[in-house]
Amino acid sequence: MIISILACTSAGGIGNKGTLPWPKNSEDLKWFKEHTTGQIVVMGRNTWDDKMMPKPLPNRTNCVVSNRLIDNINVRRLKGNIKQEVLNLQAQFPDKNVFIIGGKTIYEHTQDIVEIVYLTRMLKSWGADTKVNLERLLMNHRIKTVKPGTDCTYETWVRQT
């Protein structure tokens, strides 16, 4: 299954100056870890380069979309057609979920093949210089569950058939 997982502001803000717009949120990090551990994570080069992110993410197959070499033997580099690369991963590892974890360009290029979106919506306003179009990202999906968090809500969206 191909799944997008992201946290954003109500305006779709996902990044500010190369990192998350809000301070570390342990509750959201736990949610992310619970869903992605043991699975495949696909990210863009800017997400990989975020200083706040451990490299590689432990107990996951890390894949980075980049035309440049990745200086880490524990990472698989993807290049070319992002959507096709993700579909290839799904075919290669049918027993695993492929999680799209950012950034903006990776979400945009894969939104047509994503079956589930795990969306953490931050309740406070945070300045962001990178935003996703939530309306477009969630198009053809319907909300399945909403769980309240401390400073956020956890939403699960599923593709309509």
Feature map (PLM): residue ranges:
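Enzymes that bind and transform nitrogen-containing heteroaromatic metabolites
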Residues: 1-161
